[in-house]
């Protein structure tokens, strides 16, 4: 069977991202994709190598878009300004792109995800070290702590769990500044 004219892998992954935004990554299936794209499921195999390949593409795109947004947010910034901007970029990305964000957290066996994940870790650890929040020895621990804090905020915002009237993004900034203050104290005590 020849590929449908005009159907591309990019179109399939774009459709998968739309489904993931609405239904989560588990909602992405070949049946859901074929229905959304108005093609028979076997037609998809002319362009992709199954559901795992689609998930891998979503993960790569998600991680790449997250990295780009984080890297852009810290251009020409230092200290708290850089870290706050990075934190808000992370949370904004996750809220605005729930499908890509969920896919970015998937464990897929694809070298590209490892490369982009390493770029994200290097970006954050470099900022933490350059701005005095961590040493080479503590940077990974600080990065994990920051990621956990940001992911927690992301999940709670997505679930609409913050029901009080206080501004959520102010709460995020407050939490990040508090976390960074703790890192500064910890880093000075270690040195």
Curated annotation (Swiss-Prot):
> Which superkingdom, per the lineage?
Bacteria
For this UniProt record, give its keywords in alphabetical order, as a comma-separated list.
DNA-binding, Repressor, Transcription, Transcription regulation
Outline the extent of the HTH tetR-type domain.
6-66
User: Which InterPro entries does this UniProt record tie to the protein?
Assistant: Homeodomain-like_sf (IPR009057), HTH_TetR (IPR001647), MT1864/Rv1816-like_C (IPR025996), Tet_transcr_reg_TetR-rel_C_sf (IPR036271)
DNA-binding region listed in the record: 29-48
Keyword Transcription regulation attributed: yes
Example GO molecular function = DNA binding
What's the protein name?
Answer: Uncharacterized HTH-type transcriptional regulator YobS
Gene name in the database record = yobS
């Amino acid at each position: 069977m020849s590929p449908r004219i005009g159907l591309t892998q990019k179109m399939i992954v774009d459709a998968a991202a739309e489904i993931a935004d609405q239904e989560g990554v588990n909602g992405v299936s070949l049946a859901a994709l074929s229905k959304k794209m108005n093609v028979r499921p076997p037609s998809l195999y002319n362009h992709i190598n199954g559901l795992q390949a689609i998930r891998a593409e979503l993960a790569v795109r998600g991680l790449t878009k997250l990295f780009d947004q984080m890297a852009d947010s810290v251009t020409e910034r230092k200290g708290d300004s850089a870290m706050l901007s990075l934190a808000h970029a992370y949370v904004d990305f996750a809220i605005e792109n729930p499908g890509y964000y969920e896919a970015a957290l998937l464990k897929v066996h694809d070298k590209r995800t490892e490369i982009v994940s390493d770029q994200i870790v290097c970006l954050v650890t470099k900022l933490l070290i350059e701005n005095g929040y961590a040493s080479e020895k503590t940077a990974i621990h600080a990065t994990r702590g920051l990621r956990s804090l940001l992911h927690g905020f992301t999940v709670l915002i997505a679930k609409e769990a913050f029901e009080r009237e206080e501004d959520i993004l102010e709460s995020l900034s407050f939490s990040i500044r508090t976390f960074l203050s703790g890192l500064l104290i910890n880093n000075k005590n270690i040195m």
